[in-house]
Amino acid sequence: MKTNYILALSGNDIFSGGGLHADLTTYTVHKLHGFVAVTCLTAMTEKGFEVFPTDSTIFAHQLTSLKNVPFSAIKIGLLPNVEIAEQALEVIQAHQDIPVVLDPV
């Protein structure tokens, strides 16, 4: 069954120019329904632009919450560490019949 449901595995861009904000905006413009599992948060600190990965257990809970949604495509954004990348791979392997877009940061 084809739906207009798109899953983004994306980070939160504090400036809203990219990441999950840009993903959801793009989906809305194209009349798609976007879902997001947040891979990380970002911030501008005294050290500069920093990435704070989502705890892998929390990320897993997000993915479990979405496991029964019939997605038509998956978009992969910022993967901040190996654990999150491995979980993203599991999602891809579970959805081999739909397109996957990799948008590396």
Predicted segments, located by residue:
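Glycine-rich phosphate/dinucleotide-binding loop and adjoining beta-alpha-beta core of small-molecule
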Residues: 49-105
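Small-residue (G/A/S/T)-rich helix-start motifs and N-terminal tracts that mark the onset
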Residues: 1-73
